Design a protein with these regions (language model features):
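Phosphate-binding site recognition
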Residues: 1-152, 157
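Cytosolic catalytic cores of cyclic-nucleotide second-messenger enzymes
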Residues: 160
Length: 160
């Protein structure tokens, strides 16, 4: 695997005490979802992924009260997967498609049982639909395509 700066950032984020949700933004098709899946596979025993474009009905997880207990009950019912406290990564992909999920992050982070990563490529498009931004509950990370310099460095070391 081509080592990416984003992966190193994910590891650092995971090891941060009292971590916030990690919001990864960037252009489409640059590997955001791939790197998050790879990271989850190597660092967590449980991984739950919700893609709000391919599964628009997942938005119903956030119907009703936006408190952590209700959301986690709905999430477990929707995914039919167990949640292991302290060893589960919950990944909301294309979060711009579910403004309620973006609002709810603050309650989930406050609950502190699980780690959360959000990603999206068009986050600014629906910004007016988010009722309350999770200011202070998200760490933002901007991911970029692999640069020629980065690719060339790996090539000269025989890592490709």
């Amino acid at each position: 695997m081509l080592q990416r700066k984003a992966y190193e950032h994910l590891v650092k984020w995971k090891n941060t005490p009292d971590k916030k949700a990690l919001l990864i933004t960037g252009a489409r098709q640059i590997g955001k979802t791939y790197i998050i899946r790879k990271f989850a596979e190597e660092n967590y025993s449980n991984f739950i992924e919700i893609n709000f474009i391919t599964n628009p009905d997942a938005a119903k997880i956030f119907n009703g009260d936006l408190n952590a207990e209700t959301i986690l009950i709905n999430l477990t019912a929707y995914t039919q997967k167990p949640l292991v406290k302290g060893d589960t990564l919950i990944f909301f992909d294309e979060i711009q498609e579910c403004p309620s999920a973006r609002t709810a992050i603050k309650f989930l982070v406050d609950d502190g049982q699980f780690d959360y990563i959000e990603s999206g490529s068009l986050l600014g498009v629906r910004y007016k639909e988010v009722k309350s931004y999770p200011v202070g509950y998200e760490e933002n990370y901007r991911m970029y395509p692999v640069s020629y310099t980065h690719l060339r460095a790996h090539e000269t070391r025989g890592n490709l």
